[in-house]
């Protein structure tokens, strides 16, 4: 599964110097005019805007005036957009210190800080992000704002996942679980459920990377117990994908198919490219469940049937459903890059081949009372040993009734007891009819 869970495309956070600065205006006319004049400069002349905003900060800071807070927030944003990261961190640290001013409401300061965190998280400079998150979390520990702390820690956790820094990630997990515990009343019940699901989705990504299937199963079961939540669809996509993989490991193909379908719909709703990967898994589970329904018949999946990244799976399922072994093997060979490069799919390819061979084998032996294994092997284009293995599996699963003569390499069909009984009754009836004529 993908480790990138930044949600840039899924959440429309406006960072274009939002107009929420206008909701705390006090009658400082000269400062107010200077502030709006500075804002008018930032698009065409950001350097001049910076100088002007700094003058406001120096003029109003001693009075703990909200205009100083507003100006410093604009300075922080401009520095970030100009990629002046050191200057941005300096102004940001200063801004964090202003959040305790009595003139700044808790909701306004929280909204302002989180808006900066949200946008800065899109930065690709990992060295800057490490410093930025460190500055933010240290400051928030002193602000006693657990709601904001939780939202920020989610961003930090996503960043640590992309860096595969699992040691720090696990430390953050403990912090976030404490914040989301039932004993903590700072988070509303509905929000707690939503945050829990997001936290589980992050954990699932980490434990998927390190292939801890036991922990993944526990997380999946825990996520299903969360009832009061309105999660982002991508979060549900991750959780349902995990569920599908868990069912696949236990050979529960139909359940896996259901979970992959739900995962696909969630990723699709979120506009995530992960929908393509999970759609391949859905097709895989569909074949292994030996379903007669084409997975591309549904209105949700049909638009992707001819997608260049899906066409290999489209051809594969079509060949599979008409039991064309030769075509299945040819498609697997031709589209190795699209199919076998996925580690998850690759581990089930042998099961696909076994499944289709078994289905064809069942049809092949039906006309016979006994048949040479060599004949079956020739018709399927495989070795006698593969035929033996397939027949043994079918006998164990009670899909065919017969026995294998390993010495003479012959498979003999055994009639079910009720069939033998019915045949005997029919034969006796014929004898009686003949005798009484």
Curated annotation (Swiss-Prot):
GO terms for biological process: DNA damage response; protein deneddylation. The gene is csn2. PROSITE patterns: PCI. One of its GO terms (molecular function) is inositol hexakisphosphate binding. This is COP9 signalosome complex subunit 2. The lineage of its organism: Eukaryota, Fungi, Dikarya, Ascomycota, Taphrinomycotina. Pfam families: PCI (PF01399). Component of the COP9 signalosome (CSN) complex composed of at least csn1, csn2, csn4 and csn5 subunits. It comes from the Eukaryota. Residues 249-418 form the PCI domain.
């Amino acid at each position: 599964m993908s480790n990138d869970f930044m949600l840039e495309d899924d959440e429309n956070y406006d960072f274009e110097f939002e107009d929420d600065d206008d909701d705390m205006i006090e009658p400082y006319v000269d400062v107010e005019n200077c502030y709006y004049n500075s804002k008018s400069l930032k698009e065409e002349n950001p350097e001049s805007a910076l100088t002007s905003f700094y003058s406001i900060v120096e003029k109003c800071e001693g009075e703990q005036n909200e205009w100083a807070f507003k100006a410093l927030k604009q300075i922080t944003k401009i520095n970030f957009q100009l990629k002046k990261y050191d200057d941005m961190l300096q102004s940001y640290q200063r801004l964090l210190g202003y959040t305790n001013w009595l003139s700044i409401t808790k909701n306004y300061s929280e909204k302002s800080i989180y808006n900066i965190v949200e946008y800065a998280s899109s930065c690709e400079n990992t060295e800057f992000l490490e410093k930025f998150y460190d500055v933010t979390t240290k400051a928030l520990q002193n602000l006693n704002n657990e709601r904001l702390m939780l939202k920020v820690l989610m961003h930090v956790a996503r960043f640590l996942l992309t860096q595969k820094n699992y040691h720090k990630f696990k430390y953050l997990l403990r912090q976030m679980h404490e914040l989301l515990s039932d004993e903590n009343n700072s988070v509303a019940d509905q929000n707690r459920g939503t945050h829990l699901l997001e936290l589980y989705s992050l954990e699932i990504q980490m434990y998927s990377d390190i292939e801890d299937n036991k922990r993944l199963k526990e997380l999946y079961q825990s996520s299903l117990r969360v009832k009061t939540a309105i999660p982002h669809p991508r979060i549900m996509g991750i959780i349902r994908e995990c569920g599908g993989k868990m069912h696949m490991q236990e050979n529960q193909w139909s359940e896996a198919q259901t979970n992959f379908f739900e995962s696909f719909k969630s990723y699709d709703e979120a506009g995530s490219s992960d929908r393509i990967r999970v759609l391949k898994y859905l097709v895989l589970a569909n074949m292994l469940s030996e379903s007669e329904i084409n997975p591309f018949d549904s209105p949700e999946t049909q638009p992707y049937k001819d997608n260049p990244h899906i066409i290999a799976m489209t051809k594969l399922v079509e060949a599979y459903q008409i039991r064309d072994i030769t075509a299945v093997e040819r498609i697997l060979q031709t589209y190795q890059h699209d199919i076998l490069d996925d580690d998850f799919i690759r581990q089930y390819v042998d099961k696909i081949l076994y499944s289709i061979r078994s289905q064809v084998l069942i049809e092949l032996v039906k006309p016979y009372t006994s048949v040479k294994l060599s004949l079956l092997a020739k018709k399927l284009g495989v070795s006698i040993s593969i035929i033996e293995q397939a027949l043994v599996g079918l006998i164990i699963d009670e899909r065919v009734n017969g026995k294998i003569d390993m010495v003479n390499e012959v498979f003999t069909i055994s009639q079910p007891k009720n069939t033998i009984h019915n045949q005997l009754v029919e034969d006796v009836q014929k004898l009686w009819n003949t005798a009484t004529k």
